[in-house]
UniProtKB/Swiss-Prot annotation:
A biological process term (GO) from this entry: translation
Pfam families according to UniProt: Ribosomal_L31
PANTHER family, A to Z: 50S RIBOSOMAL PROTEIN L31, CHLOROPLASTIC, LARGE RIBOSOMAL SUBUNIT PROTEIN BL31C
Entry keyword set: Ribonucleoprotein, Ribosomal protein
Gene Ontology cellular-component terms listed: ribonucleoprotein complex; ribosome
Protein family membership: Belongs to the bacterial ribosomal protein bL31 family. Type B subfamily.
SUPFAM superfamilies per record: L28p-like
Subunit details: Part of the 50S ribosomal subunit.
GO molecular function, one term: structural constituent of ribosome
Protein name: Large ribosomal subunit protein bL31B
Amino acid sequence: MKKGIHPENYREVLFYDGSVQMGWIIRSCAATTKTMVWEDGKEYPFYPLDTSSASHPVYTGKRREVNTEGRASKFNERFKGMAGLAAKK
């Protein structure tokens, strides 16, 4: 192989989704300074994930409801007097 063209930090990295406490050890060049001891007792560079296939609603089939009631009631409260003005014109 040609020297000097391949990344030097290619190593096993623990990608961890904290919302479902699941992790995957994958060879990667992901830049991270954190480390974590995994189930096998070894210490790996640690890369935290916000969402993964284990927690994303598209993959899990579970729906998450967004709280829009507060936003809708704020909108209605703000513009409740406008309906009468529009009817008068």
